[in-house]
């Protein structure tokens, strides 16, 4: 008897550990710097994006991080910066037929129940492949505020005017577009090249503010920007989430006692990005370290790093940046006939503080290399979820939906409800709804993700009518822009 009880207990533990989460960020980066859209024209680019979004929706993705400013330019209509060459093939040239990719992507994502996070590269002013800059580009109008490094042009982080300029660009995006997030990646000070120094001597003399160590000064510059960026976004629209996706190693243990047991380039020491300072001070709403290596990598082991980030970066929601191609290229060390997707996903489930995943890059999942996308849609992301909790932004929630009523229509048996009375500000407004189902005798518990059947912007849900003999209770809650959830509204039905 004891043996049987032990088996049942272990089975319950196993099932609990792999239970579907109620909240999870399931993101994908759609980049333009790989040239996938450059010069292909409006119709072809829209067709490409529609296909990618449709496939990602099937995979269970609930957030798109879309690159809109790769080199102080714009994949949206801007009065501040020129149109991107990654859109039209020539910087400063508007798309023809005219369209606004950012506005279009917002509409496409929202219609699919996805968030849209606008992704900018804050300091990079010119990539290596750009040979011609528009006359209104910042590197043309203010070359003294930039420096060249290994074929790149960089807005000098040591010049205060550049912080203000980037925040002006961001504020323009936030004010004019209904984005759900503002996202920056790992490009702060440039990735170092042996024998090549960053040319910022004069700025160090002018703007050191009493900081005598060059590295400390550079970190201070970037931290000032990150703080200002966060405050700029939330002063304009508090619900817009600010996310940062740093390089995957904060520091190596040989450089700092709190570092990871790795041997690679470091955010803190080479990119001058003090990620933990920003997280612990609340200057971002989510962090996505790019842990692009495989399990077993000698210099930067994936398992070592995901444990490190889970332990040290829990003050804000933590999502893991996954390299799809590298994941399927490398064999599972414990099961060499399979690649590493399942092994990595187990780590996501087992470790505390992991609240989601972002796929690098979207097209790799869409192309379904190694059946990566198939596994997402069939096994890992096959249930609806809410976005991770961010009550540190605001704890308030809307009131509950009203007047739940099942009605026979020409389209079937539909559960309708009425939106709650709107409050005075954004936090009290219903943005979308969560729908739960409970069989007769089941305890009503909306914390149990197994009962979540839909997340929708509609005020109705089609019921799966069968014989009309089975009794269920449907529960609907209202969600605001950051998915804070109302009290439940209930309705008993027979299906």
Where are these regions (language model features)?
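Active-site-adjacent "subsite" loops/lids of carbohydrate-active enzymes
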Residues: 23, 31, 35-47, 118, ...
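Aromatic- and acidic-residue-enriched segments that line the glycan-binding/catalytic groove
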Residues: 74-89, 124-150, 186-209, 253-265
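Active-site neighborhood of glycoside hydrolase catalytic domains
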Residues: 161-169, 175-184, 188-291, 296-315, ...
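Pro/Thr/Ser/Gly-rich low-complexity, intrinsically disordered linker/stalk tracts
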Residues: 371-427, 483-495
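Beta-strand-rich modules
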Residues: 463-486
